[in-house]
């Protein structure tokens, strides 16, 4: 937990910096408007040539709209064929790692098919939704690798998912406002850090699995069984409640789903969906518009708070951790919810699955890789579908392209889950999931960062506007 506390301190510093930057930006913008009124009466005061004001002029011009969508025609050509192949493998590996595959989808949509970056972000979310739905359906029957519980940890999802959806709404708005160069910088820093952490966690898990295999071989050799006949089974994180019964790997969906927790998650999704639809006929930045947006906060905080209080009081536990430390402090619970919001913001802003944040976080909590991947994907199903609704209402993607690519991602995710599950059973290494997660995050950092840098250089050469967009004037 000390590592998590250090992460929290670092996160708090970054948050304070961003808040200070936002306040300074708002102050300077207001000051600039006031100066423009005074300059209209006294033309002799024309001192806006300072470096600071030039920077503000670069970052914000209220009448500038830099975004124009680029949607190529939907027709059979080499771009579609190559994009389909790349999208298929991205969805297959992304669903296994619990990250969705957005880090592969966005560059593919931009570089190969030819969408503009923000439209690529929106279509990427559609593909993540398709892959997530397929993966969740595949996982609904599966059980925890060592404990007698579902492979999806519903209590963990109930703590994180409402805050994830709140973050998605913030991230979608930021996607409209933030310039591409800022998104690129944030992406590279965040993804390089999380991929490094995930790789280290994978190495640690690999070493533990090696020790477990050696111990199992020694025990069997002492009983007169050849070590070459050893089949690896993960050591249980907690004693089985039914030691005489062999744990089933698959059960019926009705038996395997925690319906109360699922009902609460669906309730949050429906409320958020209703709020998003109700904004459709409201003027951007009107009083009603902001009231509807702010109503999302009590819904998300209420449901996550309900689960957090139950965890704090010991009425609920994160059972997938096994018999480890199940007592949570207030600071830890607040930190986990904060990470949920950050994961949502990243997902909505970059068109990625929140699994890029949730996966490494769940692993740090001591959750097994299979459960981490399944639970992160389960939460992403709700958040990605909400993002798709929001992007659709903003008219950010062409429907025919989206339907086709959703179909590709849905099939690919099912294939990926099936193949990797058999591979893990064959080699006895669940750490394979963590290495896939780390690889997907790292590849995403390189591909998305590279695309962002190329686009940024192109805009500089064309002398295009590279500042913040105006959310209140955005019309799709």
From Swiss-Prot:
The protein, known as: Sulfite exporter TauE/SafE family protein 3
Membrane topology annotation: Multi-pass membrane protein
Predominant location: membrane
Family: Belongs to the 4-toluene sulfonate uptake permease (TSUP) (TC 2.A.102) family.
This protein's UniProt keywords: Membrane, Transmembrane, Transmembrane helix, Transport
A Pfam family this chain is assigned to: TauE
Origin species: Arabidopsis thaliana
TM helices/strands, residue ranges: 8-28, 76-92, 99-115, 120-142, 151-171, 172-192, 257-277, 291-311, 339-359, 360-380, 397-417, 433-453
Disulfide bond sites: none
Subcellular location: Membrane
GO cellular component assignments: membrane
PANTHER family cross-referenced by the UniProt entry: CEREBLON, SULFITE EXPORTER TAUE_SAFE FAMILY PROTEIN 3
Organism classification: Eukaryota, Viridiplantae, Streptophyta, Embryophyta, Tracheophyta
């Amino acid at each position: 937990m000390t590592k998590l506390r250090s992460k929290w301190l670092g996160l708090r510093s970054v948050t304070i910096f961003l808040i200070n930057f936002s306040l300074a930006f708002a102050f300077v913008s207001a000051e600039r408007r006031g100066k423009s009124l005074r300059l209209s009466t006294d033309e002799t005061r024309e001192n806006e040539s300072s470096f600071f004001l030039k920077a503000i002029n670069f970052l914000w011009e209220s009448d500038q709209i830099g975004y124009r969508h680029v949607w190529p025609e939907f027709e059979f050509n080499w771009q579609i064929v190559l994009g389909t192949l790349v999208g298929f493998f991205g969805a297959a590996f992304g669903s296994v790692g619990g990250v969705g595959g957005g880090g592969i989808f966005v560059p593919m949509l931009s570089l190969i098919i030819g969408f503009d970056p923000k439209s690529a972000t929106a279509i990427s979310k559609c593909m993540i939704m398709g892959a997530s739905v397929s993966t969740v359906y595949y996982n609904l029957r599966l059980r925890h690798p060592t404990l007698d519980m579902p492979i999806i940890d519903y209590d963990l999802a109930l703590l994180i998912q409402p805050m994830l959806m709140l973050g998605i709404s913030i991230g979608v708005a930021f996607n409209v406002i933030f310039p591409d160069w800022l998104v690129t910088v944030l992406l590279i820093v965040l993804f390089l850090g999380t991929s490094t952490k995930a790789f280290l966690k994978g190495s640690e898990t690999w070493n533990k699995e090696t020790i477990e295999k050696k111990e199992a071989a020694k025990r069997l050799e002492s009983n007169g069984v050849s070590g070459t006949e050893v089949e690896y089974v993960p050591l249980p994180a907690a004693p089985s409640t039914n030691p005489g019964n062999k744990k089933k790997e698959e059960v019926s969906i009705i038996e395997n789903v925690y319906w109360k927790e699922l009902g609460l998650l669906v309730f949050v999704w429906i409320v958020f969906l209703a709020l998003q639809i109700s904004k459709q006929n409201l003027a951007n930045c009107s009083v009603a518009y902001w009231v509807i947006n702010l109503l999302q906060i009590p819904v998300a905080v209420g449901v996550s708070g309900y689960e957090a209080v139950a965890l704090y009081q010991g009425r609920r536990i994160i059972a997938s951790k096994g018999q480890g430390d199940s007592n949570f402090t207030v600071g830890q619970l607040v930190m986990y919810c904060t990470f949920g919001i950050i994961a949502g913001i990243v997902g909505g802003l970059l068109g990625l699955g929140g699994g890029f944040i949730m996966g490494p976080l769940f692993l740090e909590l001591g959750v097994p890789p299979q459960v981490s991947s399944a639970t992160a994907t389960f939460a992403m199903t709700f958040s990605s579908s909400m993002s798709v609704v929001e992007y659709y209402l903003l008219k950010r993607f062409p429907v025919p392209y989206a339907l086709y690519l959703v179909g590709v991602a849905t099939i690919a995710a099912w294939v990926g889950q099936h193949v990797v599950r058999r591979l893990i059973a064959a080699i006895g290494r669940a750490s394979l999931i963590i290495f896939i997660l780390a690889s997907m995050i790292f590849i995403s950092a390189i591909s998305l960062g590279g695309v962002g840098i190329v686009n940024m250089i192109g805009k500089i050469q064309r002398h295009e506007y590279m500042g913040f967009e105006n959310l209140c004037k955005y019309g799709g």
